[in-house]
Amino acid sequence: MSLPCYPPPLTEVKSNALNYLNYSGALKDKYRFFHSLGFLKRKFFEYPEAFQCFVAPTDSLKIIQEKYGKSYITISLRANRFQPLRNSNLQSWHAVCDYIASKGLQPIILPDFEDYFNAQSFKEMKHPVAHEAMLDLNLRMALYENAKHNLAVSGGASPLLLCSKVPYSIFKWVVSGISSCSPEHHRNFNGLNFGEKVWFMRVSQSLIWADDSIDIVMMHLKNMFDNV
């Protein structure tokens, strides 16, 4: 006759977990380091392919290409009530859209999910909006993959860009007044010194350790176009 199997007491589970945390040596600030790029790099992955895992299905790529072609640049906006300091500077992106259009490329707006169902500030942009990107992750990823380049601010859907092979530039990697976007946080939890890139990023992928002001975004774009 088999004996009943009971889970270990909660105190034992907690003790084992704490023993592991103390044993690893790479962890800082208790459990929070589990969620950091620094922990993942040290304990599991040294090769880039492990993190560049997001890809769009073939049928989604075909749908997006038929609708938008491939001569476009996406702009993923953030317009959220949570930590509004991290939101996109719409004035900057107005100018960016005009500049992109002057280069013969189509700017495609990917709105913030919350904003899409509330204030809809993205309508101020007066450029094509990829409505399908709001509810279909495959189509959103296909938009990124088919694009000449992808522009965004940190947060929101930017992890899709970070964990893919598509070309991108993510602005506001640091934001004054937001602890999780501070240089200290990136150094302590992601192993990044100011201005550095994540170890698995490609040449065509950039983190901008500055605000998305008109001057900064335009300077980055002009440099990007000059080096194409």
Label for each model-derived stretch:
Residues 1-10, 17-20, 119-132, 185-188:
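Active-site regions of enzymes building and remodeling cell-envelope glycoconjugates
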Residues 78-82, 114-116, 156-158, 174-177:
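Short, solvent-exposed loop/turn segments at secondary-structure junctions
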Residues 99, 142-143, 160-163:
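Hydrophobic/aromatic ligand-binding patch that stacks against planar heteroaromatic rings
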Residues 145-151:
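Acidic donor-binding loop of glycosyltransferase active sites
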Residues 159-228:
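Nucleotide-sugar donor-binding patch of glycosyltransferase catalytic domains
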